[in-house]
Amino acid sequence: GIECVAKRAEISTHALQGLYGELDRERLSDDLLRGVAFEAADATQYSSLDYSHLYMFDRVFSHCTLAALAKVLQRSSFYVMISSRKPQVWWDVGLHKVQPVAKMRFKTTGREGCTAFIYINKDFIPPGSEQRVPE
């Protein structure tokens, strides 16, 4: 994952290391978390974000940041994206490849209530399986 604040990337890496200690090694593969890593960087500067799943705590992102990130995401090959932003916000800043499929409430570590919107990348919807509106 990409974190814009170096200290948060460090905290995330330590949390990941802690997860390894909690895994039941006899029941789960050692490779379970092998694809998880964190780095401190500016995601808006990437050409694309080619992760399978994206989670963004984007409540604090400015319109300018969202627009820059939308350009990167529009070129990206993710399957699932989780964001605190409503679909219309993403569509308005140019991210048209996302289709909302669910939303859920959660609490942050600071006990603040939030809504997460779950999107899929329309590039990976099989042809002919789009939902049709009855006429």
Give the residues covered by each predicted segment:
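S-adenosyl-L-methionine
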Residues: 5-49
